[in-house]
Amino acid sequence: MATYILGVRHHGPGSARRVRERLEALRPDLILVEGPPEAEELLGQVAREGMKPPVALLAYEPTNPQNAVFYPFAAFSPEWQAMLYAATEGTELHFFDLPLIYRLTQTEVKAEETSEASPSVIGRAHV
């Protein structure tokens, strides 16, 4: 089985067209799309009646909802086109990326670094 990697520009209409064209030409057995592995069970929703982009996956910590990660998809997103192709052609589809815990932890660390590096606006304001 040959492996093909299709480089994309996120939310690029030209990239979305090329991905769709390449998938139709290659007719792969398996497609991997950048996304959280924990959300794989949602991939079946792509072809659901009434599901129209723009849509997004949202992951957040229930105890700290402002610590969130978004995965937006538009009709002109190459990722959406790959997911739609897989859904309509019956091609095996999986998300691949680091588990969400790493993304959420990164967000938390960046927030801490930012707050240490520069005081908040309220901290600098005279109230």
Give residue spans per PLM region.
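Compositional signal for N-terminal targeting/processing segments
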Residues: 1-124
